[in-house]
Amino acid sequence: QNHMGIIFITHNLGVVAEVCDKVSVMYAGKMVEQGPVDDIFYNPGHPYTKGLLRSMPRVDAESYERLIPIEGTPVDMLNPPEGCPFAPRCEHAMKICLQKMPPYVAMGENHRAACWLRVQDCLEEAKKGNTETANIEKTEVDSHE
């Protein structure tokens, strides 16, 4: 619109929703999800993104609703894990999550997430013959630091 861009680094997702068109969600220096702001907010593909959204106050929530924290402790950046950096805190972590970074999986036009759960979803779709929804990018997350 204005032929300019701004890199806005924040945990304030309310401001992100108001200011941004595109969002890159990072955890421990790795981009784990990227896409249009509405896709990220209404169809998050990475467990960290989902955790961020669950942990923020909502205007439409009842006043007695408690925020849901992301369990665990942040990754030790001096000794990062081999696999997905969020795996030790992820309630859905599988063995492969601890061993290897996942590839990006397309979740829609210009929306992708780096999560082995999404890869499993894509593999299931491919087995069913739904190749349109089984879109796994060959680029590894490590190259997108």
PLM features per residue range, with description:
Residues 37-132:
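Charged, flexible cofactor/metal-binding loops and thiol motifs
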Residues 138-145:
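Long, low-complexity, intrinsically disordered segments
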